């Protein structure tokens, strides 16, 4: 299937926070990563801009903010959840999903809330590798696509470039 798992991942676009990279320092369990959140933050920022992620800046320590498009307005049932959660003292924030609520380029459309995200988006408002990388690459004429195939080896030259 063109796009593979990026067709089925639900578009959930959360960042690991500082604690996730250094969990041993916080709870004594597992091992710390050899990198920190600050090391990877520039790549998260680049990815947010590339794929388009909606959300809101919340300043929650281990749920880092990113570059967000505006989230959709809450639906009626979500307003009930929010009201109940706030009454109970539970923090509620909008999802952080890679679905375009605002145009970021000329190849992908904007979500019109049809509710068919699980079946692939006809407006290309959701991120998938096929709609955002493969199809545009094919239009450039420098890529060959082999379906029903599996890569077992990528050969590289002395500079590490695929040959």
Residue ranges: model-predicted function:
Residues 1-11:
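Conserved phosphate/anionic-ligand binding catalytic regions in large, soluble enzymes, centered on
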Residues 2, 21, 111:
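Short clusters of hydrophobic/aromatic residues that line enzyme substrate/ligand-binding pockets
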Residues 2, 141, 158:
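Short, ordered coil/turn segments that flank beta-strands lining enzyme active or ligand-binding pockets
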Residues 12, 24-148:
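Conserved redox-cofactor binding core of oxidoreductases
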Residues 16, 100-103, 152-155:
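Flexible loop/turn segments at secondary-structure boundaries
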Residues 17-25:
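Cytochrome P450 core scaffold surrounding the K-helix E-X-X-R motif
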Residues 150-163:
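Conserved beta-strand-loop-beta-strand element in the redox core of flavoprotein oxidoreductases
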């Amino acid at each position: 299937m063109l796009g593979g798992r990026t067709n089925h991942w639900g578009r959930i676009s959360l960042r690991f926070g500082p604690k996730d990279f250094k969990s041993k320092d916080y709870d004594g369990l597992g091992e710390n990563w050899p990198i920190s959140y600050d090391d990877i933050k520039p790549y998260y920022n680049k990815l947010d801009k590339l794929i388009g992620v909606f959300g809101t800046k919340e300043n929650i320590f281990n749920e880092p903010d990113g570059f967000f498009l505006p989230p959709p307005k809450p639906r009626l049932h979500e307003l009930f959840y929010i009201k109940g959660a706030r009454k109970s003292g539970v923090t509620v924030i909008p999802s952080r999903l890679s679905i375009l609520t605002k145009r970021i380029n000329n190849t992908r459309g904007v979500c019109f809330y049809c509710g068919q995200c699980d079946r692939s988006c006809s407006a290309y408002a959701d991120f998938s590798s096929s709609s955002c990388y493969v199809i545009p690459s094919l239009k450039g004429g420098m890529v060959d696509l082999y379906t029903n195939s599996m890569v077992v080896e990528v050969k590289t030259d002395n500079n590490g470039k695929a040959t």
